[in-house]
Amino acid sequence: MNLALSLLHKRGFLKQCTSLKVLSDLMDREKIVFYAGVDATSSSLHIGHLIPFLAMMHLRQHGHMPIVLIGDSTAKIGDPSGKSEMRKILSSEEIGNNALLIKNQLQRITKFTSECFIHNSNWLDNLNYIEFLRDVGMHFSVNRMLSFETYKRRMDFGLSFIEFNYQLLQSYDYYMLNKIKNCRLQIGGDDQWGNIISGVDLIRKKNGSETFGLTFPLITRSDGKKMGKSEKGAVYLDSNLFSIYDFYQYFRNTSDSDVKTFLYLFTFLEEDEIELISNFKGNSLNKAKEILAFEITKIVHGEAEALKVQEASFAAFRGSGDRSNIPFFKFSFSSLKEEILLVDLMLDSKIVPSKSEGRRLIDSGGVYINGKRVESQSHLLTKKDFNNNEVELRVGKKKFLRIVI
């Protein structure tokens, strides 16, 4: 197998591929242009979106030429893949802003030049509908489209005609990139398989060219939960939506059984180093988790920020050191009262999802103020508890929050 494809396979990226042997031979002979797309439906990507772009970085290291397609036109429709209901329709202004933010985010992470980023509005915004139906729609079988899991799943919930068009548009994207950039490979998550092979078929029918599609597994944790979700919501790559400290802690708290898998997927460490550190046992495995958290934080947020939150994490668990990057909650006492029920503050700061959960944690001995266990549900936090205008709240073993006045 081609070296680049073999690396993706070893690291757990490869799920399905059209004509793998033919693609491998092609990549042995020449460096190819390949692409992955992302719709501008949000102002930030989350960790679940990152896998295709990490794979792109591996392929780029082997000399292949990446294109990141920003779906500013397809964002007006929304991909039904993995969705049980129609996406919210966004304004042109929202989509334009999202497209810029996502481009900047991915450029910072991948270090790709601006020339690697293309918007599909370049060809989709000025399509003539009648000509599109005649020249593109004629190559699609409705029966075959309905056989794909994306559409089969939505038939029970309702599928709008606008969403039904999405596969044609993504296929046309691939056709246009093949036409203007000689793009030979599209990559994406496995939920994109139907859209990708439809693009491969369209190109073959339109101009006889052989192109390829490759998908990656949709990452789930060993507990069966979807990768990229936390108690605080989606693990966004934007630090304004999900703090860098929480991002680091998300990976630092990886379950033992996921450490090796995530080291291969979310870092660029060499195979022998991953094999060594992922085989640590007992408490030593925590070192492997720290390495995982640091490496992926470095990729997404830069080495300087990764070092800051690593030190903050060490400080939180040691009780000393630079704690400035531990998340904080700004709080003001009422002008009439200089105390607050701790359970209320825990809910206000969102360190617990409900008062009942806060009470349960206190009863089980899992809540600490400045290192001292809270014994009562009726515990009051007063100004006397604050040292240099802050106290440290710890919930369980791993959740730390500075309460600042």
Swiss-Prot record:
UniProt KW Aminoacyl-tRNA synthetase keyword: yes
Subcellular location: Cytoplasm
UniProt: ATP binding residues: 229
GO molecular function: ATP binding; RNA binding; tyrosine-tRNA ligase activity
Alphabetic keyword roster: Aminoacyl-tRNA synthetase, ATP-binding, Cytoplasm, Ligase, Nucleotide-binding, Protein biosynthesis, RNA-binding
Residues reported in the UniProt entry to bind L-tyrosine: 35, 166, 170
BP-aspect Gene Ontology terms: tyrosyl-tRNA aminoacylation
EC numbers on record: 6.1.1.1
CDD domains referenced in this protein's UniProt entry, alphabetically: S4, TyrRS_core
Sequence motif: 'KMSKS' region, positions: 226-230
S4 RNA-binding domain segment(s): 340-405
Segments carrying motif 'HIGH' region: 40-49
Record field: catalytic activity: tRNA(Tyr) + L-tyrosine + ATP = L-tyrosyl-tRNA(Tyr) + AMP + diphosphate + H(+)
Any one GO CC term of the record: cytosol
Location, primary (coarse class): cytoplasm
Family: Belongs to the class-I aminoacyl-tRNA synthetase family. TyrS type 1 subfamily.
Record function comment: Catalyzes the attachment of tyrosine to tRNA(Tyr) in a two-step reaction: tyrosine is first activated by ATP to form Tyr-AMP and then transferred to the acceptor end of tRNA(Tyr).
Entries under HAMAP family matching the protein: Tyr_tRNA_synth_type1 (MF_02006)
Subunit structure and binding partners: Homodimer.
Protein name: Tyrosine--tRNA ligase
Species this chain originates from: Borreliella burgdorferi (strain ATCC 35210 / DSM 4680 / CIP 102532 / B31)
Gene this protein is translated from: tyrS
